[in-house]
C-alpha cells in the first residue's frame, strides 16, 4: 500500500521501510534560465536552450528516478522552433511524467510590475500551449528567481486553477520581517487579497549541488525539514540563470538517497507534488496560513523603476491590447470583420515574455534591450493595427452623415466616461476655430490646442457609454481665444488654484471647493533629485534606504515658467529647467468640465544624470501614518518608510487621506510603479533611477540616459477614499477616449453603439476577448470595492445563447446565470470571475469580394531549414518557410496568396507593369512587400494615381528607444503583415533575426 501511494504521488522510488524515516525531502530539480540578463535572447536560444534540452534528455535516459522540472512556455516554443528532433523526444518524457511542466505560464515573469490582467494572460497563454502541445497543464506558480511577490498572486493563481507557489527568493531580504525570520514559514498556505489561498513552499538555493552522496543521510536536509512542524523540506537543486541541468553528482546523490537507509525520505519530485500531497488543504489544519504581501526590503526596490522605456511600453501594450480586443469582438459580432486571433495572441505573447524578471525589471545588458524594445514596439504596432481596422469596421455600420467632418470616438473602458479627448484633423491651412457636436447633435465644448504640418489638434469634451462608439461632428468655424506664451507664476480653474515659486515648484495648491490648502506649509510639490544614488552590489536592482533618507534637492538651474495655454477646456504652464546635462520640461495642466478635478503633470525629460534618483514629491497638508496603494485588484495600506519596507510598488494610483477621513489626495500615473512615504504628510512617486556603480554592472551608471515622456496626475477628494472611483479615474488616464477619422455614409447602427456594460461600478469588466480555442467570448470581471459581495448585470448588445463560468485559463468550471442579453454576476470582495459567453450573431461575416493577382515570380524568397541554400532573398538569406502559412496569409482581414515555398515566390520590382482584373468593381489593390536591403522608397501607380511609398527592410528592427550613446530612436511607419522569428542564412538558422512582410494599399 505504501509503494502504491508513493507511485501515485509522483512516481518516486518505493522506500523499503518508511517508518524509519524521520523527515521528508521533496527534491525538485530545475535549470532556471534567464531569458535575458548578462546575455541576449540569441545567446539564450543558441546555447542555453540547447544545453537544457540535450543535457536533460541524457539524464532522463540514464537515471530512472530522475525527474526534471522546467518552466516557461516560450522556451518550450523555442525548443520546438530550433530543436524539433529533441523536442519530439522530450514530449515522450513529458507523457511519462518525468519531464515536468513546472509553473503554468508563458514566461516565468515578474509579478509586481505587470498588471493583474497581464499575469492572468501569462498563465492562460502558457496553459493553452501546454494543453495543445502536450495534452497536459501546470498546476503551480514556479518562480525560483523573482524580485518580490504581491498579495494578488495567490488570488491570480487560484483564479487560474493553480494550487501552489514556490521560490528561492523568500530568503532574499536584508532584514527579518516576520519575527526573527525573513519569511512567515517555509511551507504553508498563502492567502490572497480575495481570501483564496494556495500552498507556499520555500525552495532554497536553486543552484545547490551534491557530489555523489547518499542524501537520505544528509544533515542539512534533515535540519531544514525540522524547521517546520511538518518535518518536510521542499528543496530545489540544479542550476540557475543559464539553464542546462543539475550536475551528474547531484542526480546520483538523489538516486542514492531514494534507495538509502538514512533518516531522510528522499523524493525525486515534480514541482507540484508537495502541493498535491496536501490536497484538500482544509484537511490539513497543521498548515500555517499567511495573509499579506511577500515583498523584498532592499533587493528589487530599483526594479519598480529601472528601464523606464520598458515600463512605458509594457503599460501601453497592456492597455492597447485590451482596447484592440474589445473592438475586435464587437466588429466580429456585427459581422463586419473577422477576429484576428493569431495576430492578437502573438502580440500578447511577444510583449508578455519580456515581463521576465530580468527584462521588464530593468536589469539586463543594453544589447538585450534592443530586442526588448523592438518586440514591445512590434506588439504596439500590431495592437494599433487591429484597433484601427476593428473600429473602422464598426464605423462602417454607423451613420456618419454629419455637416462637418465625421469623427468616431471609442471608449474602451467598461464604464461610462465623460472626459476630454484629442482629435487630429487634416487641415490645409490654419483654421480660425472649430465647433463640435456630439452623437445627439448637441454642441460640446472644444479647444484648438495646436496646428502644425497641416494638422489641427482639437481638445473635445466627450461623453460616451461603456464600451461604446459615437459619431461626433467637427465643423470649421467659430473663433478660438489665442494667446502668446507669457511669463506666469500662477494658474487656476474652477476647482484649483496653483502658485509656483521661481523654480517652478508648487508652493500653494488650493482646492477652491473646500477652501483647502493642499501643500504642507513651507514645502513644495516638485521634482526632487537624490544626488547620492550609490548602489554598488546590485545597482539597477536596488534603491538604498540611505539614498532616500537624505534630503532631496530641487531643480533650479535655468528655470523658466511660461503660460502656454489658456483656453476654455485647458490651461497650462510650461516649466523648463536643467540639472547638469539633464533637461526638464514639465507641463502643469488644469481643465474645465469633467476633468476639472484632475491636475496633469506631463513631463518631457532628456535624462543624462548618473548617481541620481528622480522622484515627484507631494508634501501635503494631510496627515496619516498610512497611505493606500493600488495592487491592480484591491489595494493595501502601508506605513511610513522603515528599514524593512521603504521603496514599495503600486500599479496605477496611490492615495494619502487624512486620518480623520476629512480630505485626501490621490496620485495617478501612466507608467510608474515605485513609491515611498518618508513621513505622515508626504508621498513620493519614483520616476527615474540611474545609480552610481562600481565594478560589476558598470554600464548601469548610464541606465535610462535618453528622452522620456510620462504623465502623473493629482486629484483631491472631499471625505474618505472611494477606491472604486479612484480606480476609474486612473483607468481613464491610462485608457483615454480614442478618436478615428471616418468617411460619410449611412449606417444601421445610428450615431452611437455600445457593446457591453455593467450595472455596478464596483463590478468592472477587465477583459473582453474571443476565447483561444472556441468561438465564445471571454468576459472577465473584478470586484473593486473590497467591502462586501456585489451583484451586477452584464448587458450585451446581443442575446446570450450560452454562458459558462470559467477559470482564468478559459477552462469551464461551472454554470452561469443569464437571461436574454444579461449575464448575472455575484462576486466576492476583490475577487475575479471569468465567463465564456456565446452570443447570437447580429450578422454573418461578409467577406469582401477579392481576386488574387497572378505575379511572374522571379526570386526564391523562402527556404526550408533542410535546404537553406536554395533561398536567396538577399545575400543568401531567406524567409524561413517552416514559419510561414501554407498558402494564405491574412493581414487585417485581407487574404494574400503566397507563392509555393519550393520555387520562386517573390517578384523583384524593376519597373514591372501588372495587368489588373477587368469587368469587376474592385476599388482597391493590396500587396505585400519588403526591401531586400535598407529601407527603400519606390513609386507605385494605378491609372492616374501614383504613390511614393517607403518600403522597410525585410529584416532588422522595426523600432528602438534612443538610449544615449547606444541606440538611435526610430519607429517604422509601414503596416506589419507578417513577423518571422528567425531568418535562414545559407549555413544556419539565425535565431531571433526577424523577417517581415509589410502590407500596402492603393485606390
Please give the residue ranges for each predicted region.
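CE4/NodB-like, metal-dependent polysaccharide N-deacetylase domain
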Residues: 119-147, 151, 159, 219-237, ...
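C-terminal (or distal) subdomains of carbohydrate-active enzymes
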Residues: 4, 153-156, 186, 388, ...
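N-terminal catalytic cores of secreted or lumenal carbohydrate-active enzymes
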Residues: 15-122, 130-133, 159-163, 189, ...
Amino acid at each position: 500500500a505504501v509503494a502504491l501511494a508513493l507511485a501515485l504521488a509522483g512516481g518516486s522510488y518505493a522506500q523499503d521501510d518508511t517508518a524509519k524515516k524521520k523527515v521528508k525531502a521533496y527534491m525538485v530539480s530545475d535549470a532556471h534560465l534567464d531569458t535575458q540578463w548578462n546575455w541576449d535572447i540569441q545567446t539564450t536560444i543558441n546555447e542555453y536552450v540547447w544545453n537544457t534540452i540535450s543535457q536533460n534528455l541524457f539524464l532522463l535516459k540514464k537515471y530512472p528516478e530522475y525527474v526534471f522540472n522546467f518552466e516557461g512556455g516560450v522556451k518550450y516554443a523555442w525548443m520546438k522552433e530550433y530543436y524539433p528532433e529533441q523536442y519530439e523526444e522530450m514530449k515522450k518524457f513529458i507523457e511519462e511524467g518525468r519531464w515536468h511542466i513546472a509553473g503554468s505560464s508563458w514566461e516565468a515573469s515578474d509579478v509586481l510590475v505587470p498588471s493583474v490582467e497581464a499575469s492572468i494572460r501569462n498563465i492562460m497563454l502558457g496553459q493553452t500551449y501546454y494543453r495543445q502541445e502536450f495534452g497536459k497543464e501546470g498546476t503551480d506558480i514556479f518562480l525560483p528567481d523573482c524580485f518580490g511577490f504581491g498579495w494578488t498572486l495567490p488570488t491570480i493563481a487560484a483564479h487560474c486553477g493553480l494550487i501552489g507557489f514556490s521560490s528561492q527568493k523568500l530568503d532574499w531580504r536584508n532584514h527579518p520581517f516576520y519575527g526573527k525570520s525573513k519569511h512567515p514559514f517555509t511551507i504553508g498556505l498563502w492567502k490572497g487579497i480575495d481570501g483564496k489561498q494556495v500552498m507556499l513552499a520555500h525552495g532554497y538555493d536553486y543552484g545547490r549541488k551534491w557530489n555523489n552522496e547518499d542524501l537520505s543521510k544528509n544533515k542539512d536536509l534533515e535540519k531544514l525539514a525540522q524547521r517546520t512542524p511538518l518535518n518536510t523540506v521542499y528543496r530545489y537543486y540544479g542550476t540557475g540563470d543559464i539553464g542546462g541541468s543539475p550536475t551528474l553528482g547531484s542526480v546520483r546523490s538523489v538516486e542514492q538517497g531514494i534507495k538509502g537507509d538514512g533518516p531522510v525520505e528522499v523524493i525525486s519530485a515534480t514541482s507540484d507534488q508537495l502541493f498535491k500531497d496536501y490536497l484538500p488543504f482544509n484537511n490539513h489544519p497543521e498548515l500555517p496560513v499567511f495573509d499579506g504581501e511577500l515583498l523584498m526590503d532592499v533587493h528589487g526596490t530599483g526594479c519598480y523603476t529601472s528601464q523606464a522605456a520598458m515600463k512605458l511600453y509594457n503599460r501601453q501594450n497592456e492597455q492597447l491590447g485590451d482596447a484592440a480586443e474589445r473592438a475586435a469582438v464587437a466588429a466580429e459580432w456585427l459581422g463586419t470583420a473577422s477576429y484576428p486571433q493569431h495576430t492578437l495572441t502573438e502580440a500578447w505573447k511577444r510583449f508578455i515574455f519580456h515581463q521576465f524578471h530580468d527584462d521588464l525589471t530593468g536589469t539586463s545588458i543594453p544589447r538585450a534591450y534592443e530586442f526588448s524594445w523592438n518586440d514591445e514596439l512590434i506588439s504596439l504596432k500590431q495592437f494599433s493595427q487591429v484597433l484601427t481596422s476593428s473600429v473602422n469596421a464598426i464605423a462602417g455600420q454607423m451613420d456618419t452623415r454629419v455637416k462637418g467632418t465625421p469623427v468616431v470616438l471609442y471608449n474602451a473602458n467598461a464604464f461610462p466616461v465623460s472626459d476630454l479627448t484629442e482629435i487630429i484633423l487634416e487641415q490645409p491651412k490654419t483654421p480660425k476655430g472649430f465647433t463640435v457636436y456630439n452623437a445627439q447633435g448637441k454642441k460640446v465644448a472644444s479647444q484648438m490646442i495646436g496646428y502644425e504640418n497641416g494638422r489641427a489638434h482639437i481638445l473635445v469634451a466627450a461623453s460616451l457609454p461603456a464600451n461604446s462608439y459615437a459619431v461626433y461632428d467637427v465643423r470649421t468655424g467659430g473663433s478660438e481665444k489665442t494667446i502668446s506664451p507669457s511669463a506666469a507664476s500662477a494658474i487656476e480653474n474652477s476647482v484649483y488654484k496653483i502658485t509656483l515659486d521661481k523654480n517652478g515648484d508648487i508652493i500653494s495648491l488650493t482646492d477652491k471647493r473646500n477652501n483647502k490648502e493642499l501643500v504642507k506649509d513651507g514645502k513644495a510639490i516638485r521634482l526632487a533629485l537624490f544626488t547620492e544614488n550609490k548602489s554598488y552590489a546590485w545597482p539597477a536592482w536596488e534603491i538604498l534606504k540611505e539614498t532616500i533618507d537624505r534630503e532631496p534637492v530641487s531643480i533650479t538651474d535655468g528655470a523658466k515658467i511660461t503660460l502656454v495655454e489658456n483656453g476654455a477646456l485647458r490651461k497650462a504652464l510650461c516649466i523648463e529647467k536643467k540639472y547638469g546635462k539633464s533637461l526638464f520640461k514639465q507641463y502643469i495642466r488644469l481643465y474645465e468640465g469633467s476633468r476639472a478635478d484632475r491636475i496633469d503633470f506631463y513631463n518631457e525629460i532628456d535624462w543624462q544624470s548618473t548617481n541620481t534618483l528622480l522622484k515627484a514629491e507631494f508634501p501635503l497638508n494631510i496627515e496619516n501614518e498610512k497611505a493606500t496603494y493600488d495592487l491592480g485588484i484591491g489595494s493595501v495600506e502601508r506605513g511610513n518608510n522603515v528599514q524593512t519596507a521603504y521603496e514599495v510598488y503600486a500599479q496605477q494610483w496611490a492615495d494619502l487621506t487624512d486620518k480623520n477621513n476629512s480630505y485626501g489626495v490621490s496620485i495617478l500615473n501612466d507608467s510608474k510603479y515605485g513609491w515611498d512615504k518618508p513621513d505622515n504628510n508626504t508621498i513620493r512617486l519614483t520616476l527615474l533611477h540611474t545609480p552610481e556603480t562600481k565594478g560589476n554592472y558598470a554600464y548601469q551608471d548610464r541606465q535610462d540616459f535618453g528622452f522620456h515622456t510620462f504623465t502623473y496626475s493629482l486629484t483631491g477628494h472631499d471625505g474618505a477614499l472611494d477606491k472604486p472611483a479612484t480606480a476609474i479615474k486612473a483607468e481613464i488616464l491610462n485608457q483615454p477616449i480614442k478618436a478615428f477619422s471616418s468617411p460619410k455614409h449611412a449606417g444601421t447602427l445610428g450615431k452611437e453603439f455600445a457593446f457591453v456594460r455593467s450595472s455596478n461600478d464596483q463590478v468592472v469588466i477587465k477583459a473582453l476577448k474571443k476565447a483561444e480555442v472556441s468561438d465564445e467570448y471571454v468576459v472577465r470581471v473584478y470586484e473593486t470595492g473590497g467591502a462586501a459581495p456585489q451583484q451586477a448585470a452584464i448587458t450585451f448588445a446581443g442575446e446570450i445563447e450560452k454562458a459558462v463560468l470559467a477559470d482564468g485559463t478559459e477552462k469551464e468550471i461551472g454554470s452561469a446565470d443569464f437571461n436574454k442579453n444579461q449575464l448575472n454576476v455575484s462576486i466576492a470582495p476583490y475577487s475575479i470571475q471569468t465567463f465564456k459567453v456565446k452570443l447570437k450573431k447580429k450578422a454573418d461575416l461578409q467577406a469582401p469580394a477579392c481576386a488574387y493577382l497572378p505575379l511572374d515570380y522571379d526570386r526564391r524568397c523562402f527556404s526550408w531549414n533542410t535546404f537553406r541554400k536554395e533561398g536567396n532573398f538577399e545575400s543568401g538569406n531567406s524567409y524561413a518557410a517552416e514559419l510561414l502559412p501554407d498558402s494564405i496569409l491574412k493581414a487585417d482581414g485581407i487574404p494574400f496568396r503566397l507563392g509555393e515555398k519550393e520555387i520562386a515566390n517573390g517578384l523583384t520590382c524593376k519597373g514591372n507593369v501588372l495587368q489588373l482584373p477587368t469587368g469587376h468593381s474592385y476599388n482597391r489593390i493590396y500587396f505585400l512587400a519588403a526591401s531586400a536591403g535598407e529601407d527603400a522608397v519606390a513609386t507605385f501607380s494605378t491609372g492616374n494615381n501614383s504613390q511614393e511609398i517607403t518600403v522597410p527592410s525585410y529584416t532588422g528592427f522595426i523600432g528602438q528607444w534612443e538610449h544615449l550613446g547606444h541606440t538611435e530612436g526610430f519607429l517604422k511607419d509601414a503596416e506589419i503583415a507578417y513577423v518571422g522569428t528567425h531568418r535562414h542564412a545559407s549555413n544556419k538558422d539565425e535565431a531571433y533575426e526577424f523577417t517581415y512582410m509589410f502590407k500596402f494599399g492603393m485606390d
